[in-house]
Swiss-Prot record:
Molecular-function GO term, any one: phosphoribosyl-AMP cyclohydrolase activity
InterPro entries per record: PRA-CH, PRib_AMP_CycHydrolase_dom, PRib_AMP_CycHydrolase_sf
Annotated EC: 3.5.4.19
Subcellular location: Cytoplasm
Lineage of the organism: Bacteria, Pseudomonadati, Pseudomonadota, Betaproteobacteria, Burkholderiales
Binding-site positions, Zn(2+): 77, 97, 104
Cofactor binding note of this UniProt entry: Binds 1 Mg(2+) ion per subunit. Binds 1 zinc ion per subunit.
Co-factor(s): Mg(2+); Zn(2+)
Keywords: Amino-acid biosynthesis, Cytoplasm, Histidine biosynthesis, Hydrolase, Magnesium, Metal-binding, Zinc
Pfam families: PRA-CH
Bilayer-crossing regions: none
Protein name: Phosphoribosyl-AMP cyclohydrolase
Function of the molecule: Catalyzes the hydrolysis of the adenine ring of phosphoribosyl-AMP.
Amino acid sequence: MDWLDDVKWDAQGLVPVIAQEQGTGDVLMLAWMNREALRQTAALGRAVYFSRSRGKLWFKGEDSGHAQTVHEIRLDCDRDVLLLRVTQQGHQPGIACHTGRHSCFFSRLGDGAWQAVDAVLKDPRAIYG
């Protein structure tokens, strides 16, 4: 039996993936993987996701230079969520979000409204052109 068969894939053949920074424990982002993305991530030691909007593999950092080196891949108790422990590359501190922030989780609910609480580290126009 292939180790990929132990994962509970959804009806579209995908599984959600949380990327967590190895050194700080910061939650960087949530993305999706299909079997090939997970296979390549394990083989290459760098994060490869599946882009639902583009319908293809997405090598994290291929456009931005902000790749993720994968140190550990974990599967949750229900076998339907993955956790990647990563080092975020390309900037210090690492930029995981396409908005130029460290984490995609930069909005906090307060007083009935979402507020951006984390600074933009690099203008996205400078990242993506």
